[in-house]
Every structure is written in structure tokens, then in C-alpha cells.
């Protein structure tokens, strides 16, 4: 089994991912979605957590070998980023969604030198908007952001466009396509459910029609 499928299997088993194509969830944007993901749950399961963190380390070594500092997004990327930095013996920082409104007004907590080569850690990629804002903040502070790593991606076309437009490389350990096919193989969903999940990936607005 590939790492992507192994992680997908863990996410399903520990219920970090729920699939309900016949009774969809409603996202904050109002979109009806057949999938809900809470990767913070992974922190409660040592075997899953170790699989993910080791996967991150290998992915970063392969994709971003010149990395000098790991940064986690607040809050979901912080624990994973801290563990990765420890495993790689690298400095760690984290990036707030907006600057503090008191004290020094920091948006990045930790010490990042001008030109320091950074990899940003996120837990989930939907459209990529929030992590790309974090990347922009890090660049404003003088970091040389090499790219973003994440546990899981919904593989939405909007995310592909956003990362391409920003010129930011994205590496994910697992993804929507691997997960939904594995879910059908392991009996979490029916063939009809798989069909609906495939439609959602193609058209988030109209996947329930037809």
C-alpha cells in the first residue's frame, strides 16, 4: 500500500474523515459537501501521528532538501510542524492568521532570519486560501518560502489555481482521490456513493444534480 493510501486508511479508521454522499455536510461557504475532515483527531492516535510525521519528514527531505526552518499555520499546523522540526533538528516558528493586536503585534512567532528557507506545514488543503495568506505573511517578514506540505488535499481545481497563481509548490501526503477509492474498497461507501464523491470533485456546486 502506498503512503497516500496508508494515511487515507488511518484517516477513515480513526474518523478524522467522514464520508456522507447521501446526507452531505454544509461548509461555512454554504456549499453542500459529501466529506468532512478534522485532521486534529490524528494527534490522539500515536500510530497515525507517527505515520504522518515520518511521511512529512521524508516528503520535505525529497521536495525541499535545503529547508532551514519549519513553520506551522495557527492552529492546525502547529503540533505537526513542531514534531517535524524536532525530528529534523530544525528551528520552528508558527504563523498567525493575522498579527496580534497587542504587544509587538507579531504575526510570526519564533525567530526567522532574513532569507531563511522555510517550509510551511498545514493539515488540510481545500482552496488553499488560508495557508497562502500565511505564506504571504512569512514572505513579508523576509522568509524564503520553499513550499507548503499538508496531510490531505481535497484536490479542488480552485486550490490548484490558487497555488499556481501564487507560485507556491504544494506537497500533500494523501488526497481525495486515493481516499474515496480506498473507502469503497474497504466498505465505507457504496459504488453509488463513490460516483457522487467523484462528481463532487468535478463540480462542487452541482454534484447532487442529475
Swiss-Prot record:
Catalytic reaction(s) noted: orotidine 5'-phosphate + diphosphate = orotate + 5-phospho-alpha-D-ribose 1-diphosphate
Entry binding sites for orotate: 126
Listed EC numbers: 2.4.2.10
UniProt enzyme class: transferase
GO biological process: 'de novo' UMP biosynthetic process; pyrimidine nucleobase biosynthetic process; UMP biosynthetic process
Keywords for the protein's UniProt record, in alphabetical order: Glycosyltransferase, Magnesium, Pyrimidine biosynthesis, Transferase
Binding site for 5-phospho-alpha-D-ribose 1-diphosphate: 96, 100, 102, 122-130
Cross-referenced PROSITE patterns: PUR_PYR_PR_TRANSFER
Pathways per UniProt: Pyrimidine metabolism; UMP biosynthesis via de novo pathway; UMP from orotate: step 1/2
InterPro entries in the record: OPRT (IPR023031), Or_phspho_trans_dom (IPR004467), PRibTrfase_dom (IPR000836), PRTase-like (IPR029057)
GO MF entry, a single one: orotate phosphoribosyltransferase activity
Pfam families (alphabetical): Pribosyltran (PF00156)
Cofactor(s) needed by this chain: Mg(2+)
Reported function: Catalyzes the transfer of a ribosyl phosphate group from 5-phosphoribose 1-diphosphate to orotate, leading to the formation of orotidine monophosphate (OMP).
Subunit text: Homodimer.
Family under the similarity heading: Belongs to the purine/pyrimidine phosphoribosyltransferase family. PyrE subfamily.
Entry protein name: Orotate phosphoribosyltransferase
Organism: Streptococcus pneumoniae (strain ATCC BAA-255 / R6)
Lineage: Bacteria, Bacillati, Bacillota, Bacilli, Lactobacillales
Encoding gene (name): pyrE
Amino acid at each position: 500500500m502506498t503512503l497516500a493510501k496508508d494515511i487515507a486508511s488511518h484517516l477513515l479508521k480513526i474518523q478524522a474523515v467522514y464520508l456522507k454522499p447521501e446526507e452531505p455536510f454544509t461548509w461555512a461557504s454554504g456549499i453542500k459537501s459529501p466529506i468532512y475532515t478534522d485532521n486534529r483527531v490524528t494527534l490522539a492516535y500515536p500510530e497515525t501521528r507517527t505515520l504522518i510525521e515520518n511521511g512529512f519528514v521524508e516528503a520535505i527531505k525529497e521536495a525541499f532538501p535545503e529547508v532551514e526552518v519549519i513553520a506551522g499555520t495557527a492552529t492546525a499546523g502547529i503540533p505537526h510542524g513542531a514534531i517535524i522540526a524536532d525530528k529534523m533538528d530544525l528551528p520552528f516558528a508558527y504563523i498567525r492568521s493575522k498579527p496580534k493586536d497587542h504587544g509587538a503585534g507579531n504575526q510570526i512567532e519564533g525567530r526567522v532570519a532574513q532569507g531563511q528557507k522555510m517550509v510551511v506545514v498545514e493539515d488540510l488543503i481545500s482552496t488553499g486560501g488560508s495557508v497562502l495568506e500565511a505564506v504571504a505573511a512569512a514572505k513579508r517578514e523576509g522568509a524564503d518560502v520553499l513550499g507548503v506540505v499538508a496531510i490531505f488535499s481535497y484536490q479542488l481545481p480552485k486550490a490548484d489555481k490558487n497555488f499556481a497563481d501564487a507560485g507556491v509548490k504544494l506537497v500533500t501526503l494523501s488526497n481525495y482521490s486515493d481516499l474515496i477509492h480506498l473507502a469503497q474498497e474497504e466498505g465505507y461507501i457504496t459504488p453509488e456513493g463513490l460516483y457522487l464523491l467523484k462528481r463532487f470533485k468535478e463540480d462542487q456546486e452541482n454534484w447532487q444534480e442529475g
